[in-house]
Amino acid sequence: MTVPPNVTIAEARYAANDAMTLTQEYIARKLKEARKNEDDSDGYAEIPVKANTRLKCAAVLVPLAFSGGEWHLLFTRRTDRVQSHKGQVSFPGGACDEGETTPEQTALREAEEEIGMQRGDVQVLGQLSQLITISSYRITPVVGVIPFPYAFKVAGVEVARVFTIPLVWLSDHNNYWEFLLRDSERSLITYHPFDGELLWGATARMTVTFLKTIGTLTGK
């Protein structure tokens, strides 16, 4: 891995600590603590979930990359040729294949298929709480550190662009907002555009959940 073992990000905008040391070990510990304290009511559902609700299994990779002296999250923008979520910003991921027994298997396979990220190049740190989407998927986000830069090989039918956004920018409460949807108990999270890309919806919620878990969000 090309990521330094101990990376200090000194930014006054970080609420948890102005000189927070965001190491891989720290992030992994916070993810483990969050999952340990979860119960069945944790997570977020975009639809009412009843006893007879049939949910499809899915997983995404939340890729952490170290570049320019700071951590970034890596995203993709989907093409207009995919069946769903055309042109939207997302994490690499998708539905579970038959025979896959863990979210990690699904997330790493999808990342390899979509952006050419070899499974052995990802250092998995942990998982976030599950998210149930309006399309009836139960998504498990898998957080992993990736080498960067990287010789990505994108699946041209699915992925239009691969890009990163700094954690510092994502953690700034001035860059996103959450609002309740009309006639609904659900809310929507959306970010201001970054480098021409709009991060919103389920991917934005997973992003904010990750930032809350590691303690970098400011002001909210």
Label each PLM-derived region with a short phrase.
Residues V154-D195:
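NUDIX/MutT-family hydrolases
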